Design a protein with these regions (language model features):
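Terminal low-complexity interaction tails
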Residues: 137-142, 146, 155, 165-184
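Cleavable N-terminal export/targeting peptides
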Residues: 1-25, 181-184
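Gram-negative (and chloroplast) outer-membrane scaffold detector with strong preference
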Residues: 54-149, 153, 157
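A detector of low-complexity, intrinsically disordered, Ser/Thr/Gly/Pro/Ala-rich segments
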Residues: 1-6, 11, 33-36, 133, ...
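Short glycine/proline- and aromatic-enriched beta-strand/turn motifs that initiate or cap beta-hairpins
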Residues: 20-78, 167, 173-179, 183-184
């Protein structure tokens, strides 16, 4: 039921964006984030690498975005004798709103849900956890109707009952923007 509501929300965001956007963007991003994560009674320091697909629409000062991402984590150090986090991956759906601080530089607030998988199938454990984040994003535009690029610094906090963590990362993205007249 919850997944159905999220899907309906994503479709509504897409429909609203087509009608009201000054600019609609489709993008792909890659991130690397050192992460301190606790799942159950296991706490580890991880390197987390991820890829995401996004759709965004913008007004004069604001950007609204939806993301679907997949991440893979590698354990560097466990704070327990026996670690369960040496095999970990996650999928996430999130939405963000960004405010244009100055030309091509924006501050974004992110909220979403993350499905964390720990261990090797078929004995893996899956945990659904909410997260919030802040993203500082700098965009670099090329010619109109060509791919553009962005650098960004995400800070993320996961706060579920079973899974808790914090990460600070760096990322790069490629996005393609369509002027409003070309959306239809």
């Amino acid at each position: 039921m919850f997944i159905k509501r999220i899907t309906i929300l994503a479709v509504l965001i897409l429909e609203i964006s087509v009608v009201s956007a000054n600019r609609l963007s489709l993008g792909a991003e890659a991130t690397y984030s050192p992460t301190l994560l606790t799942v159950g009674d296991s706490t580890s320091l991880l390197s987390d690498a991820g890829i995401s697909l996004s759709i965004s629409y913008e007004t004069e000062r604001l950007r609204y975005s939806s993301f679907f991402s997949f991440d893979k984590g590698w354990e560097h150090h466990s704070f327990h004798r026996f670690s369960r986090l040496n095999e970990i991956s996650s999928m996430a759906f999130s939405s963000s709103i960004g405010y244009l601080i100055k030309e091509n530089l924006s501050l974004n607030a992110d909220i979403g849900l993350k499905l964390i998988s720990v261990g090797v199938q078929p004995n893996n454990i899956r945990v659904l956890s909410p997260f919030i984040g802040v993203i500082l994003r700098k965009e670099f535009f090329s010619k109109e109707n060509t791919p553009n690029f962005a650098l960004f610094v995400p800070i993320e906090y996961t706060f579920g009952k079973t899974a808790k963590g914090v990460s600070l990362g760096i990322g790069v993205g490629c996005f393609f923007s369509l002027p409003k007249g070309e959306i239809r």
